Regions:
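Positively charged, amphipathic and often flexible ligand-engagement surfaces
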Residues: 1-183
Length: 183
């Protein structure tokens, strides 16, 4: 089976597992989607491969964290080190999300992978906030702020290596060199 760190891995987008993946349907998500995602995680664990919960839009973050906690709490996955979560640095709650994941890993006595990315769906996040008439945006509106948030998240993750296996994804050469320098 090899080592989970060198074996292939898979990323799963929770919204692909249930059409109504939104907080208003939390009960349905936990009753229908969570068991599907748990089954996939168990299969990944049996193959000793990585299994990442991919990032979603910011308004789905709390729901994703509920699903993540339910899966990580499964006793069958206790000894598996291949569970991962993708966190988008451009989200204004990214730092708190990293803290929450660390606290969860401590509570459950688990080690998890966290992949930090800059973020996706920026245009959609901005448009949705405008359409809803929100007083603020859930994501940083300037690229420079997202870049700084990414580096702050990287620094934070590198300080959590007793519980978190940090992973970094970026297309920006400056960000790559900065993360290497931080490490």
């Amino acid at each position: 089976k090899g080592d989970v760190r060198t074996n292939p891995g898979i990323s799963v987008k929770l919204s692909a597992l249930l059409a109504r993946y939104e907080y208003g349907h939390k009960e349905r998500v936990m009753n229908e989607l969570m068991p599907r995602a748990l089954k996939l995680a168990r299969k990944a664990a049996a193959a000793n491969m990585g299994f990442n919960i991919d990032a979603e839009e910011q308004d789905r973050l709390d729901l994703s964290l509920d699903v993540i906690e339910a899966i990580l709490s499964d006793p069958e996955l206790k000894d598996w080190q291949g569970f991962g979560v993708v966190v988008q640095a451009f989200g204004k709650r990214a730092s708190q999300t990293l803290d929450w994941l660390y606290a969860l890993s401590e509570k459950l006595d688990r080690r998890i992978m966290v992949r930090l990315v800059k973020g996706a769906y920026w245009d959609a996040e901005i448009k949705r906030a405008q359409v809803m008439g929100l007083s603020d945006f859930p994501v940083f509106t300037r690229k420079a702020c997202s870049d700084v948030a990414y580096l702050a998240g990287a620094r934070k993750l590198l300080g959590m290596t007793d519980r978190i296996y940090p992973q970094f994804a970026t297309h920006n050469a400056h960000s790559v060199s900065a993360v290497l320098e931080l490490a």
